Regions:
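A conserved amphipathic helix/loop scaffold
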Residues: 1-180
Length: 180
């Protein structure tokens, strides 16, 4: 019925009983992903790089799936190593939904960017610059919007929201209620 799924490298390797599935990766997810893994390289903690279509470059490490798109579109390609120019991240439209496959372990800023792009594409509100481990949940109904702002850390956190600064004590939650 729609939605967005993000799968990462090694998805589909094992079944629910922890037994290896003896098929080409991503095994049972191949039709969802719209691609298959042509080859992979366990690079450990050495860094490789990937490039998005806008030219921005991000580091990746540990594992590099060389993806062969079938129905999926390429979101990013490897920018180094013997697989330079090969697909690293895909997006596939499946039914009414979208499936992303990230074939490597990326730096945090790339994950943040991918999630932000997905949120914007799906119309889900996104707060730029939200500190790590601070979350905002919004509920609406009966002409009211209620936002719950959680600090899930043991340190004081501050953030800008609607042009004003909000300071949160360790593990504090604040509620912001507005009429719509």
């Amino acid at each position: 019925n729609g939605g967005t799924v993000i799968l990462t490298n090694r998805s589909g390797v094992k079944d629910k009983f922890n037994k290896c599935i003896m098929q080409q990766l991503p095994t049972v997810y191949r039709s969802l992903v719209g691609a298959y893994i042509e080859e992979y390289d366990p690079i450990g903690y050495d860094n490789a790089t990937i490039r998005l279509s806008d030219g921005s470059v991000y580091k990746c490490r540990q594992w590099c799936d060389v993806i062969q798109p079938e129905t999926a579109e390429t979101v990013a390609t490897y920018n180094s190593e013997f697989y330079k120019g090969k697909t690293a991240i895909t997006r596939n439209h499946y039914g009414n939904g979208t499936v992303y496959y990230i074939g490597t372990v990326c730096e945090k800023s790339l994950y943040n960017r991918i999630v932000k792009d997905i949120l914007v594409d799906t119309g889900i509100p996104y707060v730029d610059g939200l500190p790590d481990n601070v979350e905002i949940t919004t509920r609406t109904g009966d002409g009211i919007e209620a936002r719950f702002i959680f600090n899930n850390t043991n340190k004081e956190q501050s953030l800008m929201l609607d042009g004003g600064e909000i300071c949160l004590a360790p593990f504090e939650m604040k509620t912001d209620i507005k009429k719509m």
